[in-house]
């Protein structure tokens, strides 16, 4: 099966939309699998950060979609120009710049690992924070807005959209969250698979 992973750590739902939109400039897949975990995080969430924004955005090619994703994702402390000219992000170290900083400013070798350390070590979970009651289990409206746009984009391109909740123990995926997605999937006739229920089958320890 030919497949591509366009996801990154802590990728927000609006970022998934623009990355999908960019992908369709190069390839029309038969199926798009979307992890719905980010539906819990709105634009005012503490989980939105420059570090994760850059992990998602910096390696994208320059395009209309990259401009759009930057504008939608920037925190109040960020500037658009710092994405165009990354050197501006590190202006405080101007006196420490070397030849290599300029040599790789607009070109760099492909780094398929993007900072990840690949290993097979297993560290069992010892303690989990207590599951707390939330004031609301509703997803932010902007998350539904972009999920609608993803759904529409897939339909317009005759792509089958499959929603999943990837296995995770924490942060908790509440039953109420699950019901929200089930209702959305049923209303829009989309497959939804909660893989948390199949952790043993998948082989996650």
Language-model regions, residue ranges each:
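Membrane-embedded segments
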Residues: 1-68
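Acidic-and-aromatic substrate-binding clefts and catalytic sites of carbohydrate-active enzymes
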Residues: 10-14, 138-143, 169-176
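Short catalytic/ligand-binding loop motif for oxyanion handling, primarily in non-cytosolic enzymes
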Residues: 40-44, 93, 170-173
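Secreted/periplasmic serine-hydrolase-like ester/acetyl group-modifying domain
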Residues: 49-157
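C-terminal regions of proteins
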Residues: 175-205
């Amino acid at each position: 099966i030919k497949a591509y992973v366009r996801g990154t750590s802590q990728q927000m739902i609006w970022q998934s939309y623009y990355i999908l939109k960019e992908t369709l400039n190069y390839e029309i897949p038969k199926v798009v699998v979307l992890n719905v975990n980010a539906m819990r995080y709105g634009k005012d969430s503490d989980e939105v950060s420059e570090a994760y924004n850059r992990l998602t955005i910096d390696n994208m090619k320059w395009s209309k979609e990259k401009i759009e994703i930057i504008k939608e994702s920037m925190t109040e402390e960020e500037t658009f120009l710092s994405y165009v000219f990354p050197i501006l992000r590190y202006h405080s170290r101007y006196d420490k710049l070397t030849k290599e900083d300029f040599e790789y400013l607009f070109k760099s070798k492909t780094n398929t690992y993007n900072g990840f350390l690949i290993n097979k070590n297993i560290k069992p979970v010892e303690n989990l924070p207590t599951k707390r009651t939330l004031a609301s289990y509703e997803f932010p409206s902007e998350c539904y807005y972009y999920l609608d746009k993803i759904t529409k984009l897939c339909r317009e391109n005759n792509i089958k959209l499959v929603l999943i909740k990837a296995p995770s123990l924490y942060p908790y995926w509440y039953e109420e969250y699950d019901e929200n997605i089930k209702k959305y999937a049923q209303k829009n006739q989309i497959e939804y698979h909660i893989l948390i229920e199949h952790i043993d089958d998948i082989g996650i320890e």
